[in-house]
């Protein structure tokens, strides 16, 4: 560890004991397994929303709002949390709504409700109609509280073919194509696009400033805000916010980040690419649902996942990447690496009351 990082790690340990304790308490509260009985009415709706908010979102912005209305729950995009530098067309926002939709439907089934999701074009929202059904707590539902985006090196070992088939089956959708790339030449090609995309983003001041604004450099800030990217969730030390801002400028460089992603990709068992059949909001939601099932099934199997979306976020690279992986003119929506590896401290969520309208 560089001396500067070692020193700041020590400082964090001395300064943020209280913040770390609050963070541990917040983790237990956020990622808890709730009871499957005893909820009804608004309380049941709020519990389903809680599970929905455990879905991933770009920079952990939690870019959603939920409206409860008798037998329906509607998920709206929260455009006050948009990230115009990395996501100028709000693509990631609607993918995130899809992830939340899938979690909610899985949770509804566990609580004795069938959820049917439809995209409301007029309101750019997802409307989920709920009706009674025999309760079933599926493996995917049980995995919701354990799923995380694990931004770490994996063990480099291949995934068994039976497990790959389970991942493919979980992601299956009539409106989304999913590609699982596991051979080394294909992964090296993906890595090349990741490095190109990362270099472009790292040289984009607007992107860097936007990312920095969503980083929570210590547990106290992570708990206070309940959103964003907690530094320890990426394997980085916990430091005061003012010091984290200074360190960010020194250590967050194209060279360092590219070296990290080379290690991350080369230690991964494979890469999954998700592409909607059409390039519109409704299909982006479906991409999110497909990916979330994939991520939950991976969690069931003890497989970690993490986003490496640079090839689809940099517009000039996207069509070249699509051609390279055999998608032709279809827009690729998500690039996900997967493999077995460690868990990291989880990100937090805002309370349910903060996302209800």
Per-range role (PLM):
Residues 2-357:
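Acidic, surface-exposed loops and disordered segments
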């Amino acid at each position: 560890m560089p001396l500067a990082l070692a020193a700041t790690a020590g400082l964090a340990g001395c300064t943020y004991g209280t913040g770390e304790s609050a963070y541990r308490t917040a983790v237990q509260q956020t990622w808890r397994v709730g009871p499957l009985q005893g909820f009804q009415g608004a309380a049941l709706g709020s519990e389903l929303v809680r599970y929905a908010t455990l879905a991933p979102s770009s920079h952990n912005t939690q870019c959603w709002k939920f409206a409860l209305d008798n037998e329906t729950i509607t998920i709206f995009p929260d455009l006050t949390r948009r990230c115009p530098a990395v996501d100028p067309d709000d693509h990631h926002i609607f993918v995130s709504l899809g992830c939340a939709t899938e979690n909610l439907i899985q949770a509804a089934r566990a609580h004795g409700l069938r959820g049917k999701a439809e995209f409301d074009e007029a309101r750019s929202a997802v409307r989920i109609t709920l009706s009674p059904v025999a309760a079933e707590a599926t493996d995917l539902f049980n995995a919701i509280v354990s799923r995380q985006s694990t931004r770490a090196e994996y063990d480099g070992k291949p995934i068994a073919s039976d497990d790959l088939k389970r991942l493919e089956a979980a992601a299956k959708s009539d409106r989304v194509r999913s590609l699982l790339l596991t051979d080394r030449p294909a992964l090296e090609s993906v890595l090349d696009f990741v490095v190109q995309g990362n270099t472009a983003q790292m040289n984009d001041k607007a992107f860097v400033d936007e990312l920095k604004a969503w980083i929570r450099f210590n547990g106290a800030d992570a708990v206070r805000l309940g959103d964003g990217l907690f530094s320890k969730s990426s394997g980085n030390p916990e430091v005061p916010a003012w010091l984290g801002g200074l360190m960010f400028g020194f250590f967050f460089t194209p060279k360092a980040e590219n070296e990290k992603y080379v290690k991350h990709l080369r230690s991964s068992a494979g890469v999954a690419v998700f592409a909607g059949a059409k390039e519109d909001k409704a299909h982006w939601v479906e991409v999110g649902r497909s990916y979330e099932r994939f991520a939950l099934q991976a969690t069931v199997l003890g497989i970690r996942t993490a986003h490496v979306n640079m090839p689809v976020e940099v517009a000039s690279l996207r069509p070249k990447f699509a051609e390279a992986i055999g998608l032709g003119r279809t827009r690729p929506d998500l690039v996900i690496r997967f493999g077995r590896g460690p868990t990291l401290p989880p990100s937090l969520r805002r309370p349910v009351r903060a996302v209800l309208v």
